[in-house]
């Protein structure tokens, strides 16, 4: 939903935003996800690129997780980051825009602070500049909550896949989100203050690490 909402916003603002869908090979979930994305692009006359993980590399996320010894979510994130950048560089796109929202980014920061690594923390933020071999990355929804993004999809009539990825069960990111939601209920605005505080007081002290 986040990516579709962002694609809709960028296209309405006049950006020549080309969509990228990665077919991850996660059974019927991946099939339905592709169908929804293709329908969105078709209805709005937008250009969509599709990369099938199995066709391009011979394996999907489940197989990659077994081969690498990583949990499925980790293998998925790693493969998506690599492919997104590869396509951007090969197609000549200088900027990659992703739909990560406030809830996503707060959970990532929470996890990174629990297992702090300077290089990882240095890459945390709404903008990463272009580097040799790496397209610039931006996250326009960085300060918008998941609830706000959902409201956007409802107002714009954007149909999206409501079901969670079957591989997400037990993911640490869901635990982090649950913990932050608990804090947010008692302290409204806590997630945004958490992110803004990091960006204003900690991030400037870190060198932007290499990918």
Residue ranges and their predicted role:
Residues 1-122, 134, 142-155:
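ATP-dependent adenylation/nucleotidyltransferase module used to activate substrates
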Residues 18, 41, 120-211:
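ATP/NTP-dependent adenylation/nucleotidyl-transfer catalytic domains that generate, transfer
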């Amino acid at each position: 939903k986040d990516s579709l909402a962002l694609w809709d916003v960028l296209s309405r603002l006049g950006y020549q935003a080309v969509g990228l869908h990665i077919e991850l090979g996660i059974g019927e979930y991946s099939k339905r996800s592709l169908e929804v994305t293709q329908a969105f692009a078709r209805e709005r006359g937008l250009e969509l690129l599709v990369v099938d993980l199995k066709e391009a590399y011979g394996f999907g996320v489940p197989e990659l997780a077994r081969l690498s010894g990583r949990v499925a979510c980790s293998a998925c994130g790693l493969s998506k980051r690599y492919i997104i950048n590869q396509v951007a560089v090969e197609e000549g796109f200088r900027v990659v825009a992703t739909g990560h929202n406030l809830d996503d980014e707060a959970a990532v920061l929470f996890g990174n602070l629990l297992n702090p690594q300077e290089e990882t923390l240095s890459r945390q933020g709404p903008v990463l500049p272009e580097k040799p071999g790496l397209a610039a990355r931006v996250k326009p929804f960085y300060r918008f909550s998941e609830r706000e993004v959902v409201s956007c999809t409802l107002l714009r009539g954007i149909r999206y896949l409501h079901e969670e990825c079957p591989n997400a069960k037990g993911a640490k990111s869901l635990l982090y989100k649950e913990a932050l939601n608990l804090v947010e209920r008692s302290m409204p605005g806590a997630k945004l203050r958490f992110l803004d505080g990091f960006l204003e007081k900690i991030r400037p002290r870190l060198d932007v690490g290499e990918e």
